[in-house]
């Protein structure tokens, strides 16, 4: 919305659901419920067969290859899938962080985008989870790491 339009619409009521915190809250609550009750993270854990151990040999299998640390963290977070509600909660939190970092990056770039556009990566991740053949934790964590690196670049002083 342009500033001139904002002045014209000042006295008119706005839709509560389509904009602001209420719509965003409804989206992430729906996201959580869909992952918890429809996708069932326990089935994802069973389908991928992800194991995790706090041992040095297990860590060395990950640390010796590119992207291994991300896979290690993904294997750790996949253990939350033993409880459907906990796996859904952690995945929703990761997607919410993706939303927050995306919003911050858009403001650094000088733009204003509605929240409905900023949740599109979460929807794409949700579509991928419906297949039960994906690396369920690697995709959101990889996206989160990439966005965090871009945000870090913007925050570096004197660039």
Each predicted region: which residue ranges?
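Membrane-interface micro-motifs in multi-pass membrane enzymes
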Residues: 63-67, 114-159
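Eukaryotic intrinsically disordered, low-complexity segments enriched for acidic and Ser/Thr/Pro residues
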Residues: 82-83, 95-99, 120-123
């Amino acid at each position: 919305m342009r500033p001139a339009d904002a002045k014209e619409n000042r006295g008119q009521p706005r839709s509560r659901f389509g904009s602001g915190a209420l719509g965003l809250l409804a989206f992430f609550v729906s996201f959580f419920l869909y992952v918890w009750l429809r996708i069932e993270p326990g089935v994802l854990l069973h389908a991928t067969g992800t194991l995790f151990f706090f041992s040095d040999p297990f860590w060395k299998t990950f640390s010796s290859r590119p992207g291994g640390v991300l896979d290690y963290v993904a294997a750790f977070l996949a253990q939350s899938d033993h409880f459907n509600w906990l796996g859904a909660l952690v995945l929703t939190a990761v997607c919410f962080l993706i939303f927050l970092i995306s919003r911050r990056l858009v403001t650094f770039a000088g733009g204003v985008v509605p929240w409905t556009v900023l949740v599109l990566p979460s929807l794409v991740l949700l579509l991928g989870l419906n297949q039960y053949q994906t690396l369920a934790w690697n995709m959101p964590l990889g996206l989160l790491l990439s966005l965090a690196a871009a945000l870090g670049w913007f925050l570096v002083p004197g660039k």
